[in-house]
């Protein structure tokens, strides 16, 4: 079966960098050097890594959103991983940094998104990079500018672990920027699954069948099957695997949160005030 490519992309998977203050301080230092040298360019105000280009429609957002969360769930953190930024150079009309350390994350995102039936990645080889600025045509033709850019030095590492402020986002091409970030369609903290550890090995130990109706009322329409047996299986299966659906239910259902936290349910005597947040 032929692979469809996002050679005319309209969205991308974004890894924002503005929240990494040490990196941004050094990144802005590079931009200041360019401006101080008089290089005619447009400075990038939202530093980021484009991890995958997408050709999707609004009806695909949910599928891509789920794929991102599944990638996060299946990550094997160990002691984390490092992202390395180095070698300022010209790529097309842009001044960029080489980015190393996210190749596996790129591959996982592309594979998981394609598994959902959505179009991801381009036919040309993906090159990890971080854009510093975009040159004007006039600036690109000046040899002194090119020589100066090639002489610039940069070497910085960011360690990513479950407590890092790392995020994966769906962004539409041309999206507005504010305070160093793109306007997003969806944004997920990469360490989010470590917030919610299952309190027991079996959901059945703390909840009963009648809980499914209470939980269903607090979720989005269609999240849980109408059949109670099917709904229970979906809750139990995903709960045991601590995957994206558990996190979704945990966030959306205050009753589910209280039951998990208390290792007990109160569905027969359920009333709204019994699940108020502390």
Curated annotation (Swiss-Prot):
Disulfide bonds: none annotated. Pfam families: Corona_NS2A. This is Non-structural protein 2a. Belongs to the coronaviruses ns2a protein family. It comes from the Viruses.
